[in-house]
Amino acid sequence: MLAKRIIPCLDVDNGRVVKGVQFLDIRDAGDPVEVARRYNEQGADEITFLDITATHHGRDTTYRTVERMAESVFVPLTVGGGVRKVEDIRLLLNAGADKVSINSAAVFNPEFVQEASQRFGAQCIVVAIDAKKTGDNTWEIFTHGGRKPTGIDALEWSVKMAEYGAGELLVTSMDADGTKAGYDIALMREINNRVSIPTIASGGVGNLQHMADGILKGGADAVLAASIFHFGQHTIPEAKQFLAAQGIEMRL
């Protein structure tokens, strides 16, 4: 059985981490490279960097930040945000990203995922799914940071993205995100019942049990979290020990 993964997530705007980070020994809390280095030292299995800068000017900053990060971080690095064309993926991979996350662009042009997967290999294409609950066991895909409804059924979409060559699905519950009430377990379970590619649970972690539930009850292959780590509530080694104690295979 493959070890499950813990993935801290950095939201970066114009080269600065925006969901505050309170590592006491980091003088400049806003530098994503410092934050990533710290997570690397703590034993994160991967690091996800979401660029929420919309401006073209900001993209150059992003490539530079990814280059710096790749030089000081020795775990797989996933970069997402504003990825709209094959050239964006090429530039990010060249800068040192191991995987690239595609979100809104996949909704507007599903063939983009196919093209990216064929060109670069499924192993480096992650499709990010932002889903909102609309009824009993139904969820809808939203774009633009969860602001725009698409009318697309999230479960059907997950299957389609797997068929189109996504190597992994990053599933965020818009309902759970920021609540600290735990992942949307039903959503994860329904998606995992339908696809065979790895899934990452995202949105809603408030404690370590939530991470365990994402894996044991939701069937996730990896669990993503931000504030639980950023604010020093828990360290990655603590999280790994906690999960391992529940019988989950971890890289300790």
Swiss-Prot record:
Signal peptide range: none
Broad enzyme group: lyase
GO biological process, one term: L-histidine biosynthetic process
Its job: IGPS catalyzes the conversion of PRFAR and glutamine to IGP, AICAR and glutamate. The HisF subunit catalyzes the cyclization activity that produces IGP and AICAR from PRFAR using the ammonia provided by the HisH subunit.
Subcellular location: Cytoplasm
Subunit structure of this chain's protein: Heterodimer of HisH and HisF.
Reaction equations catalysed: 5-[(5-phospho-1-deoxy-D-ribulos-1-ylimino)methylamino]-1-(5-phospho-beta-D-ribosyl)imidazole-4-carboxamide + L-glutamine = D-erythro-1-(imidazol-4-yl)glycerol 3-phosphate + 5-amino-1-(5-phospho-beta-D-ribosyl)imidazole-4-carboxamide + L-glutamate + H(+)
Amino-acid biosynthesis listed as a keyword: yes
GO MF annotations, alphabetized: imidazoleglycerol-phosphate synthase activity; lyase activity
Enzyme Commission (EC) number: 4.3.2.10
Gene: hisF
One GO cellular component, as annotated: cytoplasm
Species per Swiss-Prot/TrEMBL record: Acinetobacter baylyi (strain ATCC 33305 / BD413 / ADP1)
Metabolic or biological pathway: Amino-acid biosynthesis; L-histidine biosynthesis; L-histidine from 5-phospho-alpha-D-ribose 1-diphosphate: step 5/9
Record keywords: Amino-acid biosynthesis, Cytoplasm, Histidine biosynthesis, Lyase
Active site: 11, 130
CDD domains from the UniProt entry: HisF
Protein name, entry field: Imidazole glycerol phosphate synthase subunit HisF
Domain of life per record: Bacteria
Family designation: Belongs to the HisA/HisF family.
